[in-house]
């Protein structure tokens, strides 16, 4: 979910998802091998092998006309003042994005671990989701963009949380365009959640806004989710803005790869659990992260 820029030759660096270019004191292949081994070893133990098997298959498709662009990001987040979950957590995250001849797909996986020694619940959990989208413009080979409207897509949100059934949300996505944004998407989902019923609806917004000043290159990226709270459920608001700073460029390396920054995450009725004086589910958490983007 980042900016597009100079790519490395595919023979020297695997072409994956979300990024710009690459320059580091060690080779991309070595970094990828170490990161992939570390993540796969742990996530496979947690029933996430399907995600891990998916990415190499996508990578092999790079040589065909089906793939326009793809990249992968790895990151490490420390989060504080959570509610429901452990108050302090550390979480390795793997994200991927691909642009294809018929649409695009976003993949996200997180392995969350407690840093709170007195937490009595599950100290480790995982969550992953796949969001494939089919583009009306690409399928019909007809550009429907007009003014701020860029495209209309059919979207699907397939997600899994540890010890829970799958969520499946089909929806309609509207992509927007403007000179000052990298991307802006609005998606309306019908929720068929882990309880196995079509009992809610969701509005999802995600965005990327780059800017720079005398301190360097920045971007604001994030998501906003609002569930309507149908059929007696509490409405939920989940806002997660992040401020990214291009640390790699500051250190003299090629821009667009090594990032650091802060994240805020105010939530109302977290996990659709009604906030009460006896059990608080409204939160305002914050955190820091380091992130590496590569092809």
What are these regions (language model features)?
Residues 1-67:
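Cleavable N-terminal export/targeting peptides
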Residues 62-113:
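Short glycine/proline- and aromatic-enriched beta-strand/turn motifs that initiate or cap beta-hairpins
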Residues 94, 130, 170-174, 203-207, ...:
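Membrane-embedded beta-strands of outer-membrane beta-barrel proteins
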């Amino acid at each position: 979910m980042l900016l597009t820029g100079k790519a490395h030759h595919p023979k020297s660096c695997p072409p994956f998802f979300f990024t710009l270019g690459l320059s580091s004191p060690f080779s991309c292949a070595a970094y990828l091998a170490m990161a992939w081994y570390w993540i796969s070893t742990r996530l496979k133990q947690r029933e996430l092998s399907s995600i891990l098997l998916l990415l190499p298959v996508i990578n092999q498709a790079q040589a065909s006309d089906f793939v326009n662009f793809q990249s992968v990001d790895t990151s490490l987040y420390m989060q504080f003042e959570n509610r429901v979950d452990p108050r302090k957590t550390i979480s390795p995250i793997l994200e991927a994005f691909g642009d294809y001849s018929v649409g695009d797909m976003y993949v996200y996986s997180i392995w969350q671990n407690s840093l709170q020694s007195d937490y009595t619940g599950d100290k480790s959990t995982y969550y992953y989701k796949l969001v494939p989208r089919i583009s009306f413009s690409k399928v019909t080979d007809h550009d429907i963009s007009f003014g701020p409207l860029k495209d209309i897509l059919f979207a699907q949100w397939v997600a899994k949380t540890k010890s829970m059934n799958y969520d499946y949300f089909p929806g309609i996505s509207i992509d927007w365009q403007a000179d000052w944004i990298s991307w802006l998407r609005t998606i309306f989902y019908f929720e068929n959640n882990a309880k196995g019923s079509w009992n809610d609806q969701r509005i999802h917004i995600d965005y990327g806004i780059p800017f720079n000043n005398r301190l360097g290159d920045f971007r604001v990226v994030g998501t906003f989710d609002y569930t309507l709270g149908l059929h007696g459920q509490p409405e939920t608001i989940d806002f997660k803005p992040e401020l990214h700073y291009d640390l790699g460029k500051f250190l003299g390396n090629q821009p667009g790869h090594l990032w650091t920054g802060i994240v805020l995450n105010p939530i109302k009725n977290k996990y659709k659990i009604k906030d009460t004086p006896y059990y608080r589910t409204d939160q305002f958490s914050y955190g820091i992260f380091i992130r590496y983007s590569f092809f």
